[in-house]
Amino acid sequence: MADRNLRDLLAPWVAGLPARELREMTLDSRVAAAGDLFVAVVGHQADGRRYIPQAIAQGVAAIIAEAKDEASDGEIREMHGVPVVYLSQLNERLSALAGRFYHEPSENMRLVAVTGTNGKTTTTQLLAQWSQLLGETSAVMGTVGNGLLGKVIPTENTTGSAVDVQHVLASLVAQGATFGAMEVSSHGLVQHRVAALKFAASVFTNLSRDHLDYHGDMAHYEAAKWMLYSTHHHGQAIVNADDEVGRRWLASLPDAVAVSMEGHINPNCHGRWLKAEAVEYHDRGATIRFASSWGEGEIESRLMGAFNVSNLLLALATLLALGYPLTDLLKTAARLQPVCGRMEVFTAPGKPTVVVDYAHTPDALEKALQAARLHCAGKLWCVFGCGGDRDKGKRPLMGAIAEEFADIVVVTDDNPRTEEPRAIINDILAGMLDAGQVRVMEGRAEAVTNAIMQAKDNDVVLIAGKGHEDYQIVGTQRLDYSDRVTAARLLGVIA
């Protein structure tokens, strides 16, 4: 293939290279094999250049390495017959390099980016489902996994490495994908993992406290998210006008589509817009009446809570901006399915309603509790914990929110990792006014079981934090555990 040789791959940057055929591209020397291109980047934890001898021993055809402190930009050396090309700022160039290697897959499908603290997974899933109902072959990439709808393979990170992203997109194109919805994390933006992708549209859901252990403060976190619009090929911009940050961004994005549930739309100021006119919540979901610059309509949704209505409206606005007809979108809307582990409802006769959600930030927990309250005739229970070795500042905030919005709070473990579980729980309790009224149970399975067994049939039990996850990280061990499976077993239903 044309760009699978070293000379053609690096033609925009380096001349005089041999036309050496390349089989695969990898950042991991452990999996580098005969004929591969090994890329030696300098990361946060390791310097890939240390593994060049190992890659050569394993038979790689060529190497691209970070030039900093080693060589000049574009310098070519040879080690044991293997060409080594040094490029400066290799991490920043990696997405473009991988894009050339995999034949620019983002240009061969309609690819939509979704960024924001909360709502990324639901919005991407809705986009993929809806577009497929309209005839596309759709795929998702993100927290739940990567793949065509119905064939998603679990992943470790929301946004993989720059090479992984291009590789996965190329694989999806090869499988026939014509539409892709990708979650884009703040880490992925700062680390240039999606820098060379050509997005047909980019969606902003909201911004609230998360990842401050990485970004330091909210200003840097916002700046990371803004990179999607300021330094990337973002295509159509769709922005949540109900979010304070979103309203600020709309002032800098005059062609963006503004989306609102709360009346933050002025048709005279926003050329393209979509807003909820009325929302009625019921035990089956919600009835949404909306108006937009494309027309108006009504949607029956099986999704739970106000924030999921917002996610649905963002997906609708995105597809309208991409040219899908409103009439077709309205005809297919009722067939949209709830998303696994995202306000996912489990019910059985004579048992409490159990809702499993991924909410693991203060804002997400508040919204999940508010959503569950809309569907609760009895007591609202909240079972949650906070992750170990992560942002400690959010723990008391989440404790205060659970105490304020739930009737009964059960604090337990959620991936304690290398921290002492009781220390994490104490951090959560520190945010509560009356911690003595809180039920504390370190074992998560026991806590979930206890809550469901004690709740009455008109109660709602929100199990927050893990969502789709099927593991619990204790120490450095990844143990099998699923809130969904536990809840389903106790109710006698199938997860």
Curated annotation (Swiss-Prot):
Q: What biological process terms from GO does the record include?
A: cell division; cell wall organization; peptidoglycan biosynthetic process; regulation of cell shape
Q: Name one GO cellular component term.
A: cytoplasm
| Record keywords, A-Z | ATP-binding, Cell cycle, Cell division, Cell shape, Cell wall biogenesis/degradation, Cytoplasm, Ligase, Magnesium, Nucleotide-binding, Peptidoglycan synthesis
Q: Which residues bind ATP?
A: 116-122
**A Pfam family this chain is assigned to:** Mur_ligase
The subcellular localization recorded is:
Cytoplasm
> Which residues does this entry mark as bearing N6-carboxylysine?
225
Map motif Meso-diaminopimelate recognition motif onto the chain. 414-417
Q: Give GO MF terms, alphabetically.
A: ATP binding; magnesium ion binding; UDP-N-acetylmuramoylalanyl-D-glutamate-2,6-diaminopimelate ligase activity
Task: Provide the catalytic activity annotation.
Answer: UDP-N-acetyl-alpha-D-muramoyl-L-alanyl-D-glutamate + meso-2,6-diaminopimelate + ATP = UDP-N-acetyl-alpha-D-muramoyl-L-alanyl-gamma-D-glutamyl-meso-2,6-diaminopimelate + ADP + phosphate + H(+)
Name any cofactors this protein relies on.
Mg(2+)
Main localization, broad class: cytoplasm
Amino-acid positions noted as binding meso-2,6-diaminopimelate in the UniProt annotation, renumbered to this chain: 390, 414-417, 465, 469
InterPro entries xrefs: Mur-like_cat_sf, Mur_ligase_C, Mur_ligase_C_dom_sf, Mur_ligase_cen, Mur_ligase_N, MurE/MurF_N, UDP-N-AcMur-Glu-dNH2Pim_ligase
Q: Which family does it belong to?
A: Belongs to the MurCDEF family. MurE subfamily.
Q: Please explain the role this protein plays, according to its UniProt record.
A: Catalyzes the addition of meso-diaminopimelic acid to the nucleotide precursor UDP-N-acetylmuramoyl-L-alanyl-D-glutamate (UMAG) in the biosynthesis of bacterial cell-wall peptidoglycan.
The protein depicted here goes by the name UDP-N-acetylmuramoyl-L-alanyl-D-glutamate--2,6-diaminopimelate ligase
Species lineage, top-down? Bacteria, Pseudomonadati, Pseudomonadota, Gammaproteobacteria, Enterobacterales
- Gene symbol here is murE
